[in-house]
């Protein structure tokens, strides 16, 4: 047997294996980076539903003196297509206690049949999309002439 041929074949095989292994490593090696830039973006996710509150004076006329009948003064529409359990209407400022107030400080109690009164605010457990309430002056109330204002905050709750 020729020793030169025997030694040459395994050596050639080893060289081929090393060379092909090196090629495989070169294919998986990280490329040389010539440019880079960090990236970032912001995406806003809007809250579900469409919360809306409309509060305005009713169109009927109120005449000063003792009222013969319940008389509408304000109308409130609260709506939200999102999931909720109910609503609070909290009188604020000079209207705390549930009154409309004139510039000279005259106070007249407001009432509504659509909401319940609890200590310092009106509320309703109603998860429907739209809730309306009319606030009125009670029959028998004495009302002086002037402009009256009601201030409050509407809260929507889920629990």
UniProtKB/Swiss-Prot annotation:
KW Transcription (keyword) present: no
Name the InterPro entries for this protein.
Fimbrial_Virulence_Factor, MyfA_PsaA
Q: Main subcellular localization, coarse class?
A: other
Annotated Gene Ontology cellular components are: pilus
Keywords, in A-Z order: Fimbrium, Signal, Virulence
Q: One Pfam family of this protein, by short name?
A: PsaS
Q: Where is the protein situated, by its record's location annotation?
A: Fimbrium
Q: Where is the signal peptide?
A: 1-29
| Assembly and oligomerization | Forms a homomer composed of subunits assembled in a large structure resistant to proteases and chaotropic agents.
The free-text function statement in the UniProt record for this protein reads:
Major pilus subunit. Expressed only in pathogenic serotypes, it is part of myf, a probable virulence factor.
Protein name, as recorded: Fimbrial protein MyfA
- Species per Swiss-Prot/TrEMBL record: Yersinia enterocolitica
């Amino acid at each position: 047997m020729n020793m030169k041929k025997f030694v040459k074949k395994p050596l050639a095989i080893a060289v081929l294996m090393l060379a092909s292994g090196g090629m495989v490593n070169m294919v998986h090696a990280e490329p040389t980076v010539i440019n880079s830039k960090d990236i970032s973006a912001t995406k806003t996710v809007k809250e579900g539903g469409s919360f809306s509150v409309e509060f305005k004076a009713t169109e009927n006329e109120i005449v000063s003196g003792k009222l013969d009948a319940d008389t509408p003064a304000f109308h409130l529409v609260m709506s939200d297509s999102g999931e909720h359990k109910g609503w609070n209407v909290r009188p604020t400022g000079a209207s705390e206690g549930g009154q409309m107030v004139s510039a000279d400080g005259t106070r007249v109690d407001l009432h509504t049949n659509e909401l319940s009164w609890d200590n310092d605010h009106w509320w309703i457990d109603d998860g429907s999309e739209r809730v309306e309430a009319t606030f009125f002056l009670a029959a028998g109330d004495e009302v002086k002439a002037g402009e009256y204002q009601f201030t409050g905050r509407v809260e929507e709750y889920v629990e």
